[in-house]
Amino acid sequence: MRACPTFLSRGLLALWIGLTVLACSHPGAASAADDAARHVAIQFSFDRPIEASMAPFFMAAKDGLFGAEHLVVSFNSAAGSPDALARIARGDIDLALVDINELIRFRDRTDAAPIKAVFVLFNRAPYAIVARRSRGIHTLSDLEGKTVGVADSDLSIRLWPALAHQNGVNAAHVRFYKMSAAVREPILSAGQVDAVAGFSYLSAVNLRDRGVPADDLAVLRYADYGCEAYGFAVVVNPSFAASKPDAVKGFVRALIGGLNATVKEPERAVDEVVSRMEDGVRDLELARLSTVLADNILTDEVRRNGLGGVDPVRFDRAIAQIAQDFKFRRRPATSDIFDEQFLPPMAGRLIN
């Protein structure tokens, strides 16, 4: 009976010797095995279907930047920021792109996981009211007495009270018409409402594609009227961040590289996006990317301070604006929501 362990030990020893000899005789195979073992798998969720603003992620994948950081990244889509945050909290995914303002509200729950953002992609939130000039709307104050279509899942409307108050608009005189996101642009193009709430780079481009003349569109960007909110940001599962901080840092570095590549080669970036879409239209996505880079990503603040970070003073003002529609149990500090330790130094975050 005692011979069995001895036999097993000798068998394992022989196997180990054989593998050692094989590795020594084929160093390339051993190196490849070691390299594969060092790679970290990441499950990443976007909070909505693929569109042009996601180009930096796909460029990082296409150009091998994630691989250079020893990461294997898989992409999927959630049904909105709340769904993506729930997936992160459960540990179903490791990182996600979500609306940072929804993260702020999520973190105020009594049972909320301590999820934090590690990279802000949209330095300015894309919230906007997109209106028809032919309906007499040219500025924010012209919305009084008008009807604005709002999708059920729309997050921009949560900051409308602060925006209206800041600009002297009587919010009680603006009518809101609830609708499905799928019919938001068709209803405006058909003239059933005077304006719609949404994202500037999505709704405006979609409406032009539906035949609404560009000079008939008034794109009233919240940021142009004093909204301090940041926009989409990369968030990470707390356990993943604690156990694999180098992987998170590597992801951020690769994303910055992908963003720089997107800025330099927007047409190639759009080709990569469209290749991942079921029914993407290249010209529309190129227009979308051009808009989002100019309006939301490459802002003056980003050109001064670099990609991915936040200004704590501005962030606090943004939280104050959220508080006009949302009652916090405890108002958060910037450090409760954003973790800057995963960002490279500023020199590595400047637009090349």
Model regions and ranges:
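Secondary-structure end/capping motifs
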Residues: 243-327
